[in-house]
């Protein structure tokens, strides 16, 4: 849409002003409820609405947005069901997460929204995976991932920017620099004066934007979207300010009063209103009418939500939400043709057959392309399946696993290879806090398989020989597989690739070339969680 103050009709400008004002009016009501003891917590985005609303308005509805906890305006601009949204924010039955959360740790696939986890910058690699899926399918869409200034010091920020640049992904990295972490000023945590300067280090444009000017935000995002679609990623730094506490309980005593007052004078809604009135595209009376209309709607909706029951659940319901339903296994026929093969051959055969059967299967990891992986499991794959489906990654275990999540959200079947299982420790956050919780939080199937060569016995030393499968076996939401025979390796890997849940597939390096056994030549799957009786 055109810049709002250049819109052709008063109706256009009024609709935009309503979109800009709505999150403010909702927040004002929530803060009132908080003071009354009728709401337990709130993370305010007051003063930052221009970024959330401006970005969401400028992007196409088909584009992915990965917002943060202060971006209520993204959800309202994407026209999320208001009754469910209010139930979510107020912890009542009818919310999006069944009471497991009362903020934005969920996604809405129908709105192309992917919510955050609390670990800063963790969703940026996910945006890379979404971008790769869009590129793989040759879709004219982008992914826009929000991040705070503090989050730009996290490793996931740098891993994601590097991956997006190396792969030329259609991703916009949008940083809200609001001056503070929790209480630490940005200049005590971030070395460069402009975070946008990081773009040059990753061969992408880095643009500083006045985040309190909604027209500037829309213009920057519109241009970034065009660049991302045609040439690759863009880094936008939106300069703004957090005029309230990190959350309401912490207050703002650590912020100089004059600094808060200075930024209140730059309030984005007031700035737009003044410009719209000066340009004659929207009268003050019309703006007052919009506010009155919104306040009445919010009051009515809030009172309705307060009459809804508190969230209740049962242990059975909670356990039942951890995993998506798995397909039934298809074991081999008793008289199936078999071949005597090594353990590694069985793994390779399972992966190759799956890629032949299903174009959605994508393999990525360090050295997996022409080199074929350190243990040569993917040897010859790039020649058969091409670089779009067999992709080398940088040394970014966290970034690669997060990208796998993004690919899975978009319906692809990623297989992420760890060079050695020892290095999976660098990706634990993505595995335990992101992959493992996604279905529980918002019902999204996450069919990601992480292959990891593990164990000792080959003289590889202390950092290439560890066995850490027990770490993950204690994590709800993960399926952990450790095959012992070639037959099991092939069948269980095919099962993993058909799973709508994250699977950690540990392959013992000592077994790769030292164990042989009969393996059915055709495709088959074996059930998870059922012991095979080898001897009696």
Over which residues does each language-model region extend?
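Conserved acidic/glycine
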Residues: 1-51, 58, 238, 244, ...
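Short coil/turn connectors at secondary-structure junctions
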Residues: 11-13, 17, 38-39, 60-64, ...
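Cofactor-binding active-site loop characterized by glycine-rich and histidine/acidic residues
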Residues: 25-167, 185-191, 196, 201-203, ...
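Acidic-glycine-rich active-site phosphate/pyrophosphate-binding loop
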Residues: 26-30, 93-108, 195-196, 370-384, ...
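General beta-strand structural signal in soluble alpha/beta enzymes
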Residues: 44, 65-68, 97-99, 106, ...
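Thiamine diphosphate
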Residues: 51, 111-177, 209-227, 369-445, ...
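Glycine-rich ThDP/TPP pyrophosphate-binding loop and its adjacent helix/strand module
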Residues: 113-297, 307, 473-536
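Cofactor-binding beta-sheet edge motifs in enzyme active sites
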Residues: 343-344, 446-469, 473, 478-479, ...
């Amino acid at each position: 849409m055109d810049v709002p103050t250049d819109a052709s009709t008063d109706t256009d400008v009024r609709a935009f002003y309503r979109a800009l004002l709505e999150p403010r009016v909702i927040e004002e009501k929530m803060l009132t409820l908080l003071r009354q003891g009728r709401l337990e917590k709130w993370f305010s985005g007051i003063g930052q609405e221009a970024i959330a609303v401006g970005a969401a308005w400028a992007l196409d509805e088909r584009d992915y947005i990965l917002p943060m906890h202060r971006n209520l305006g993204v959800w309202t601009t994407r026209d999320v069901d208001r009754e469910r949204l209010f139930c979510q924010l107020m912890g009542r039955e009818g919310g999006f997460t069944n009471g497991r959360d009362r903020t934005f740790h969920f996604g809405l696939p129908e709105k192309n929204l992917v919510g955050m986890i609390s670990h800063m910058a963790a969703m940026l690699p996910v945006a890379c995976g979404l971008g790769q899926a869009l590129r793989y399918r040759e879709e004219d869409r982008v992914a826009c991932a929000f991040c705070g200034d503090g989050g730009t010091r996290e490793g996931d920020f740098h891993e994601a920017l590097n991956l997006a640049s190396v792969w030329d992904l259609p991703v916009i990295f949008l940083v809200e620099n609001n001056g503070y972490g929790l209480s630490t000023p940005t200049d005590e945590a971030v070395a460069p004066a402009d975070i946008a300067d990081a773009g040059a280090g990753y061969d992408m444009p880095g643009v500083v934007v006045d985040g309190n000017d909604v027209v500037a935000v829309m213009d920057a995002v519109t241009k970034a979207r065009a660049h991302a679609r045609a040439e690759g990623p863009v880094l936008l730094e939106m300069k703004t300010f957090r005029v309230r506490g990190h959350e309401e309980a912490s207050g703002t005593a650590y912020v100089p009063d004059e600094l808060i007052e200075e930024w209140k004078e730059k309030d984005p809604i007031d700035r737009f209103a003044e410009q719209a009135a000066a340009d004659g595209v929207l009268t003050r009376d019309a703006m007052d009418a919009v506010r009155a209309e919104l306040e009445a709607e919010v009051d009515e909706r809030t009172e309705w939500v307060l009459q809804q029951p508190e969230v209740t659940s049962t242990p059975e319901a909670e356990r039942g939400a951890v995993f998506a339903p798995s397909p039934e296994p298809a074991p081999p026929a008793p008289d199936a043709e078999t071949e005597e093969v090594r353990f590694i051959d069985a793994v390779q055969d399972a992966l190759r057959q799956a890629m032949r059967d299903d174009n959605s299967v994508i393999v990525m990891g360090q050295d997996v392309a022409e080199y074929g992986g350190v243990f040569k499991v993917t040897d010859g794959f790039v020649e058969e399946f091409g670089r779009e489906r067999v992709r080398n990654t940088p040394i970014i275990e966290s970034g690669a696993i997060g990208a796998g999540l993004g690919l899975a959200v978009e319906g692809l079947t990623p297989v992420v290879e760890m060079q050695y299982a020892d290095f999976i420790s660098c990706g634990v956050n993505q595995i335990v806090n992101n992959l493992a919780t996604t279905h529980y939080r918002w019902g999204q199937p996450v069919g990601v398989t992480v292959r990891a060569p593990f164990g000792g016995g080959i003289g590889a030393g202390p950092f290439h020989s560890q066995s850490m499968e027990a770490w993950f076996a204690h994590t709800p939401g993960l399926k952990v597989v450790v095959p012992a025979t070639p037959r099991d390796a092939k069948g269980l890997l095919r099962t993993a690739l058909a799973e709508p849940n994250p699977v950690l597939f540990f392959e013992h390096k000592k077994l790769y070339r030292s164990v042989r056994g009969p393996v059915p030549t055709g495709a088959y799957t074996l059930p998870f969680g059922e012991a095979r009786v080898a001897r009696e």
